[in-house]
């Protein structure tokens, strides 16, 4: 079994998407920006406590990176020289298998306490980020890719 030296970035579920467009009755209700991954990361850092980050948010592959080691791109680096968060996420990606992820969609329309009326069509479009944005590799000139097999709301 070939183990690749490529890991996934923190908050991987949300880093795979650069923009989330939400439509209600064919009218876009979200602002079209390419900063969804950054918003999701900041919302995760600021709105969740340590217990949530260590439990339910790991389903989106959120593992806290080691301070001062975020530029270490080799996920196999062990000990104090490596990034513990990258190493924890590498466990899931090292065999290039299927990873099941779960997490909320960080969009204002989903954070409201109001309910959606019956017969109002809801359409969510998840626009992918580049592979280079959501993967970290210590090797140069490699073509690692993320392939989505299924998605459910």
Where are the regions a protein language model picked out?
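Short, low-complexity Pro/Thr/Gly
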Residues: 1-153
